[in-house]
Structures are given as C-alpha cells and as structure tokens.
Amino acid sequence: LLTPLLKAMPQKIDEDMVIKLAKDMCSALELCRKHGIIHRDIKPQNIMLLKSGIIKVTDFGIAKLPNTETVTMTDKAIGTVYYISPEQASGRLIDPRSDLYSLGAMLYEMVTGQLPFYAESSVSVVLMQVNDDPVPPRELNPSLPRGLEQIILCAMEKDPEYRYQNA
C-alpha cells in the first residue's frame, strides 16, 4: 500500500516519484472512467505500490458502477473524509472528477507531508473540504515546482467544472 511509503518519508515524497505516481494514478482513473466506474474512495490505503514500481488501485467496495443510480447510501456521504471531494461530502451527484479531487488531495499530502485539511472531528474535516481552500502547497514546500502546485490545486478545485475534466 502507498500508506507505508507516506509514513516512511520524513516530510514529503521525492517530486519525480510523485509525478510518476500521479501519471500512473491518472491512467488507472481514466480506465475506470472509460468503464463508467467512479471509485469514490481514492486514498493512500487503496493504492498498492508493487516492488516493480507499478501501482494498483484497490478496494472498489464503494465504487459507483455503470448503470447504478445510487451515489450515496441513505443520503450519507461515503468515502474517507481526508480525501473526499466537496460534492461527495455534500451528498451531491458525483462523476469521475470526484476521484480526481481525491487524487489531488493525495498528491498534496505527498508533496507537503501534510493533509490538505485536518481537524479533530470528521465533521470539521468535511466542512473544510466543502468550504475552505487548502494552504497553497508551495507555502509548505517552497522547493515545489509551480507547475506541480498548479496541477494539485486544479485537481482540488471545489467546483468540479473548474477541475480537470478527465484524468
């Protein structure tokens, strides 16, 4: 899983590794999109990094599959609060751009060593996901290339219309 890699790093993951992981994740998410699948729980614990360097997306347990209309369970948002998209956190309709938001949150953590939003309660984190902008990554990691920061912030736009439209 990617989680041990994040925990093993003193602060942040090497930018070349982040870029490679981002490209591989985008390929995986694009394949999901082409098959009509929305993962809905993209987070480090659901990404396997094989010894060969290949990544595998795991845990499609709450994925939205093609031709299913339910996007929430009993009107509750599902997913992991630290990586959940604002629309998913609000119980609104989601599409593949929700997974891109989650990927952006993961990348943010990789390059800064911090979650984009953190609070003691899950409810507070959800409210931050919906209402607050993250601290710009370069404020936490000044050596981060501006282009990579822009990619992360675009993926984490609150409004899906302003995010990347596909992986």
For every predicted segment, state its role:
Residues L49-G53:
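Activation-loop N-terminal segment of eukaryotic-like protein kinases
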Residues Y82-A167:
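C-terminal lobe helix-coil module of Hanks-type protein kinase domains
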Residues K56-D59:
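Pre-DFG segment of protein kinase catalytic domains
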Residues L21-A22:
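Activation segment signature within eukaryotic-like protein kinase domains
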Residues L1-I13:
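AlphaC helix of the protein kinase catalytic domain
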Residues T74-I84:
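Conserved activation segment of eukaryotic-like protein kinases, specifically the C-terminal portion
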Residues S27-I37:
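Protein kinase catalytic-loop region centered on the HRD/HxD motif
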